[in-house]
Amino acid sequence: TAISSSIERYQRSKETTNYRAFIDAAQPRRRDFFRRLNEVPGATFELVSMRRDLLSLLAENPELGVLDIDLRELFISWFNRGFLVLRPIDWTSPAHILEKIISYEAVHEISSWEDLRRRLAPPDRRCFAFFHPSMPEEPLIFVEVALCAELPSSVQDILSDGREPTPEKEIEYAVFYSISNCQQGLAGISFGHSLIKTVVAELSQERPKLKHFITLSPVPNFARWLARHNIQDGPD
């Protein structure tokens, strides 16, 4: 095969041209096809949606796994941190974006527009999302943050109705209480740690007096990252 021949040539002589020939032989042609498709406006979202549908078929059609690998490898490149844009989400954000926040919330269900308002409108509540320039109307992942005077004992303290906003001068804690991935077609591509680290930097710059950053939302391996950066991990 072309791959075997290119490997043999490279093993005999590790020249750049032989390495390039091996890469070209090993690269599935369909990846070039997907790259060309992605040049069409709006195609990125359609390809992400296609992988979402593909993932639902893998259990009964394992032979499609090679196609999933190709799409995942392309998405890892296309959606790397350098391309992502952090945007704050608040009560004045466009309605279609707010509707998606309601729909995509995966940790603590948003039961109504009033429930969403309680999470976004008060001055001691923040929400941040990553977007991609090719999908500007589709959040990739978002995190909800409560700014508190003391460590809350549970998420119910944060979401309770009728509470009074924390006075600005008393805020010492930033509590990350919910983080939600939005695009099923990007499953297996990690955004959570990058989002948290970026938001920590954003809030630290915005509010230098913030002393503690904690999480009440399960983020894989997040506790280890918190420990490395001397940030407190709160109770579940």
Where are these regions (language model features)?
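Extended, composition-driven regions rather than compact fold-specific motifs
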Residues: T1-D236
